[in-house]
Amino acid sequence: MMNTKKLIKMFRKWQQRAALHRKRISFQRPSTRSTTVEKGCFVVYTADNTRFAFPISYLSNSVFQEILEISEEEFGLPTGGPITLPFDSVFLEYLIKLIKRRMDGDTEKALLMSISSARCSLQKQEQSTQQLLVF
């Protein structure tokens, strides 16, 4: 039989070796997407799970502020998760092109009105489907 002190010593030795091996194990990420963002940028996801990184300067754009407010109303504030926009990637790419072109005030107002009217029509559709489900 082995001495208790010897068993404890052997156990601690194996624990140390196991700890060393645990530190060396690195798992490969299954996706090739980068989870890091450049300094001065933030990330949003679209409804179809496409990832977009924007410079923080976009936050001063009124159109971008409006779509973030829509996202907040739709999904709530993210708690530990990414910001998700209720639009698909095609619409967001179109929006980026308009912002990069520095659209004039009339175009910006028209875009804001179309976004807000689409939001209102979506809310009406949701209310009507909720009423249908009740009856």
Curated annotation (Swiss-Prot):
It is a peripheral membrane protein. Pfam families: Auxin_inducible. Keywords: Auxin signaling pathway, Cell membrane, Developmental protein, Growth regulation, Membrane. GO terms for biological process: auxin-activated signaling pathway. Transmembrane segments: none annotated. InterPro entries: SAUR_fam (IPR003676). May promote auxin-stimulated organ elongation, such as hypocotyls, stamen filaments and petals. This is Auxin-responsive protein SAUR66. It comes from Arabidopsis thaliana (Mouse-ear cress). The lineage of its organism: Eukaryota, Viridiplantae, Streptophyta, Embryophyta, Tracheophyta.
